[in-house]
Amino acid sequence: FLSLIPTAINAVSAIAKHF
């Protein structure tokens, strides 16, 4: 599960860059 955290953070960061 912990291995999915960096991926989730990267996804949120990528989305946040559009705003």
From Swiss-Prot:
Which keywords has UniProt assigned to this entry? Amidation, Amphibian defense peptide, Antimicrobial, Immunity, Innate immunity, Secreted
**UniProt PTM:** Shorter peptides due to unspecific cleavage of this peptide have also been identified.
Q: Does the keyword DNA repair apply?
A: no
Describe tissue expression.
Expressed by the skin glands.
**Residues carrying Phenylalanine amide:** 19
* GO BP annotations listed: innate immune response
Identify the GO cellular component terms for this protein. Answer: extracellular region
Name the coiled-coil region(s).
none
Keyword Secreted assigned: yes
**Where is the protein localized?**
Secreted
Q: Which family does it belong to?
A: Belongs to the frog skin active peptide (FSAP) family. Phylloseptin subfamily.
The protein's job, in short, is:
Antimicrobial peptide with low activity against Leishmania species (L.amazonensis and L.infantum). Shows low cytotoxicity against mammalian cells in models of peritoneal macrophages.
Q: What is this protein called?
A: Phylloseptin-N1
- Source species: Pithecopus nordestinus
